[in-house]
Amino acid sequence: MKFNEFLNHLSNYEPGKDIEVIAKEYGVKEVIKLASNENPFGTPPKAIECLRQNANKAHLYPDDSMIELKSTLAQKYKVQNENIIIGAGSDQVIEFAIHAKLNSKNAFLQAGVTFAMYEIYAKQCGAKCYKTQSITHDLNEFKKLYEAHKDEIKLIFLCLPNNPLGECLDASEVTKFIKGVDEDCLVVIDAAYNEFASFKDSKKHLEPCELIKEFDNVLYLGTFSKLYGLGGLRIGYGIANANIISAFYKLRAPFNVSNLALKAAVAAINDDEFAKKTLENNFSQMELYKEFAKKHNIKIIDSYTNFITYFFNEKNSTDLSEKLLKKGIIIRNLKSYGLNAIRITIGTSYENEKFFTEFDKILR
């Protein structure tokens, strides 16, 4: 059977390995997952209670207007409901953006190393990819590439902070760059980890209401999978000019997000204590990862996220990842990104200590 020719140029996305699979494969009783940047404290208590109260409604289709969650987000971000679209994870909104803007006759621009799904979704449409030589977000290089190919480039991805490296840009740098982009080119700001960046440094904070007020060609993406601990429910959102959102709705299937996910998301937003606990733990424990890296002469990039990336010269990331798996510790090997590096999610103090103990033995 023949398939779309664009599939010949695609590779499958490699997700983090599952706890149960590793336990069975390696015969370990305790498995610690520090691979997928999930919340180490699990699901917010208010969301858990909400799910309990609504579990008997799983047979019902959701309210397709999603009015409760939209109104909650609109109040949080000081925008209108018409500026918001809800997706089954923010990656579904990425897919909407790509299908709305890209085809085999145009192109997109991204950092040399960034979230893999941008390229996977875009190549499904046959779009050409322009990448910076720098693995991080070098806006001077972005500007040069855009100016050289602006007739082709119709979509730009800025992952802020960047996954899988963790670096971030000041908000003022971002807005200055966007001012040089034509209105017909959509700038997607993937802010999946921006709550972490904003907590660490207010200069990194991106305010969607200000962005869409100043620019008609900006899409701000948020998710409930990281800070809010709802990765398993698959729910995220996009905020943009009403005309952009209206176009995306033509690509959205009805009932694309479950009623339980919608209810839990509202509860999670209102669980301030859980969010505060998560952020404080993240950056206090991050310091221990920096100290460990310094002790072992491991190169890092200052991270504004809930993960840290370790770069190696002599050691091999695949070998290190395999040795950690044998100890029941799952991290993310970044070989598929062309890097001799591993990405580690910041866990609980117990999980992190277990990582330090076992990795210290491996590195000797």
Swiss-Prot record:
InterPro entries: Aminotransferase_I/II_large, HisP_aminotrans, HistidinolP_aminotransfase, PyrdxlP-dep_Trfase, PyrdxlP-dep_Trfase_major, PyrdxlP-dep_Trfase_small. The keyword Hydrolase does not apply. Keywords: Amino-acid biosynthesis, Aminotransferase, Histidine biosynthesis, Pyridoxal phosphate, Transferase. It is an enzyme of class 2 (transferase). CDD domains: AAT_like. GO terms for biological process: L-histidine biosynthetic process. Gene3D superfamilies: Aspartate Aminotransferase, domain 1 (3.90.1150.10), Type I PLP-dependent aspartate aminotransferase-like (Major domain) (3.40.640.10). Its EC number is 2.6.1.9. The modification N6-(pyridoxal phosphate)lysine is found at residue 226. Its cofactor is pyridoxal 5'-phosphate. GO terms for molecular function: histidinol-phosphate transaminase activity; pyridoxal phosphate binding. Coiled coil: none annotated. It catalyses: L-histidinol phosphate + 2-oxoglutarate = 3-(imidazol-4-yl)-2-oxopropyl phosphate + L-glutamate. Pathway: Amino-acid biosynthesis; L-histidine biosynthesis; L-histidine from 5-phospho-alpha-D-ribose 1-diphosphate: step 7/9. The keyword Amino-acid biosynthesis applies. PANTHER family: HISTIDINOL-PHOSPHATE AMINOTRANSFERASE, HISTIDINOL-PHOSPHATE AMINOTRANSFERASE 2. Homodimer. Belongs to the class-II pyridoxal-phosphate-dependent aminotransferase family. Histidinol-phosphate aminotransferase subfamily. This is Histidinol-phosphate aminotransferase. It comes from Campylobacter jejuni (strain RM1221). The gene is hisC.
